[in-house]
Each structure stands twice: as structure tokens, then as C-alpha cells.
Design a protein with these regions (language model features):
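Amphipathic alpha-helical packing segments from all-alpha helical-bundle domains
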Residues: 128-150, 160-165, 169
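Conserved phosphoryl-transfer catalytic core
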Residues: 76-86
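Short, amphipathic alpha-helix enriched in basic
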Residues: 21-56, 64-71, 75
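C-terminal ligand-sensing/allosteric alpha-helical core of TetR-family HTH transcriptional regulators
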Residues: 95-109, 136, 140-147, 193
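Hydrophobic alpha-helical connector segments
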Residues: 85-119
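Long, charge-rich low-complexity segments
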Residues: 203-236
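Hydrophobic/aromatic-rich alpha-helical bundle segments in the mid-to-C-terminal region
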Residues: 150-166, 170-194, 200-211
């Protein structure tokens, strides 16, 4: 079982130009207010004041105020998850189990601040927040695959992340209503979703090996070969 304790040892930083900024303190302070006030401007101003962050600096760090602070909280938890995944030295695990464990790690981290995450998901569910909601889910999926050293360079880069995004988004919604001990029901839910994905992959493989599938892929593979994974901009 994965155990994650609240600790001051973790430091979440972002880079603005050439300046590395520590956001852990303001996120920690905000989490004291969010359960009562939510991710709003009141929480944002209280957190900035208590962290001694000026109004000018706060607008530089969080242009959209409470929204960007909320997203920084989620990104911080993603980074914690990434570090835990990389610490796991069990290289004998199948990829199925590695992905399952990664999702569970992320949920356990979220469970440390469940009310804050609940309010974040509620805010992200509003229609005008759809782009941020989609980006949040995608970024978590991407963080998991990157932490697992995914080396895909073609269309599989996208399909892996899209599939995992579906599993993660459905899991986190299920977790919000889970009151079981040690998140047992959520863990079972994750395994069921992964089983469904594996069953689909099995069907897809059978189709590829069939006569119809081979004929279809003759043309489709030409298109798929043009799709490449994004590359980092080395000119920055």
C-alpha cells in the first residue's frame, strides 16, 4: 500500500523567466482557507497576504488570481505523484500494474486534501472552465506516462494519454463519493477501468490481425505514420 504523509520537505517551484519561484508556501496557506471559502478571490488574497506576497507579484505569479492558484495546487500534487512513481524501483511490474499504481498514487495524494480537490473539480466543471478542465486531466495523464518513461514517438503517444485521461477522469469522480476504508472501492474501480481498456486493446489487436483489419491498415498506416509526438523546443 502506498502511504503519503503531509510534509514540508516537498517544494513546488515554477520558473518565470530566469527566476525560480517557490509556490509551496502559498499553496499550503491557501489549503487552510479553501475548505471554508473555496477557490475564490477571498482565499487568494488571504493566502497572498499571509505569504507576504505583494499585489504586483501575485498578479505576475497568478494572472487569473484564484483560478491559477487552484491549478498550481493541482500541478503541485501531480509533481508529488511523479516523484513517487520514479521512486518505485520494482521494474518487474507489467505496464498495466504500473499505470494502475500511478493512478492510485495520484488519488491518495488528492485524498490528503479532499475538500480542496472537490471544490477544484466543482469549479472546473463550470462551462467557461472547460479548457482548463481538459488541460488538467490531460496534464495528469501526460505526467504519469512521462514518469513511466514512455518512449512513444507516433500516434501511440496520443492514444495512450487519451485513454489514461478517460480512466483518470472517471476515477476521480468516483473517488469523490468514496467513503470506504483505505479507498478500497476506488482502487477496485481503477482496476475495473484498466480491465476494460485491456479488453478493448485485445479486441483491437484481433482486428489488426484479421483480413479486414490488415486491408484497412494498409491505407490507415500511411496516415498514422505522419502523426508524431510533440517535441520540446530547444531554442528557449
Amino acid at each position: 500500500m502506498v502511504e503519503i504523509a503531509k510534509s514540508n520537505a516537498f517544494v513546488y517551484r515554477i520558473r518565470i523567466g530566469f527566476i525560480l519561484v517557490n509556490l509551496s508556501e502559498i499553496i499550503t496557506i491557501a489549503l487552510k482557507h479553501v475548505p471554508f471559502d473555496g477557490w475564490n478571490e477571498k482565499t487568494f488574497k488571504l493566502a497572498c497576504n499571509e505569504a507576504n506576497i505583494s499585489e504586483v507579484k501575485s498578479k505576475l505569479l497568478f494572472p487569473r488570481g484564484s483560478i491559477d492558484l487552484m491549478l498550481a495546487f493541482i500541478s503541485s500534487d501531480n509533481q508529488k505523484m511523479t516523484e513517487l512513481i520514479k521512486i518505485d524501483k520494482n521494474h518487474e511490474k507489467k505496464y498495466r500494474d504500473k499505470v494502475t499504481d500511478a493512478i492510485i498514487k495520484r488519488i491518495i495524494i488528492a485524498d490528503l486534501n479532499k475538500e480542496a480537490m472537490r471544490k477544484a473539480i466543482s469549479a472546473l466543471s463550470l462551462p467557461h472552465m472547460f479548457p482548463d478542465n481538459a488541460a488538467m486531466i490531460w496534464n495528469t495523464s501526460d505526467a504519469i506516462w512521462n514518469a513511466l518513461d514512455d518512449s512513444s514517438q507516433d500516434i501511440n503517444w496520443y492514444t495512450k494519454r487519451t485513454t489514461l485521461a478517460w480512466v483518470y477522469s472517471s476515477t476521480i469522480l468516483y473517488w469523490l463519493g468514496d467513503e470506504s476504508k483505505d479507498l478500497l472501492k476506488t482502487k477496485e474501480f481503477v482496476n475495473r477501468r484498466i480491465d476494460e481498456v485491456m479488453e478493448f486493446e485485445s479486441i483491437k489487436m484481433k482486428f489488426k490481425m484479421s483480413k479486414v483489419g490488415k486491408e484497412f491498415l494498409k491505407g490507415a498506416e500511411k496516415v498514422f505514420s505522419l502523426i508524431k509526438a510533440p517535441t520540446a523546443n530547444t531554442n528557449l
